[in-house]
Amino acid sequence: METLVFNETKIDVNEEGYLKNPSQWTPELAHELAREANITLTDKHFEVLNWLRAKHAEGVALSIRKVGNSGIVDIKQFYGLFPGGPLKISSKIAGIPKPVSCI
């Protein structure tokens, strides 16, 4: 098992850096994960991240289309917020597992 140390706390991650335990996620950790992806988080980013976390907790299989239909952002905005693989990157920053729909 791999670990990430953040604020003197060990965080369990998988080989791709996704949190194994979403309850270890904090907004501060999200900022750090976003920095690693060269993203500066805004309130709009957190709206998306919180929506992703809520849907994951409900057991919803996430997809780019579902995010685009969320009412928070459309697909173009989603790509703008998380360039280079929006669902994959946003899920990692949100502290949830990589969605099955991501390669």
Task: Report the location of each language-model feature.
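N-terminal first-folded block
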Residues: 4-35
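A broad, low-specificity signal for short, low-complexity segments enriched in glycine/proline
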Residues: 9-13, 38-40, 61, 72
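Helix-rich interaction surfaces within compact, conserved domain-sized segments
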Residues: 13, 64-103
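Metallocofactor- and cofactor-centric catalytic cores in central/energy metabolism, strongly enriched
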Residues: 20, 30-59, 64-66, 83, ...
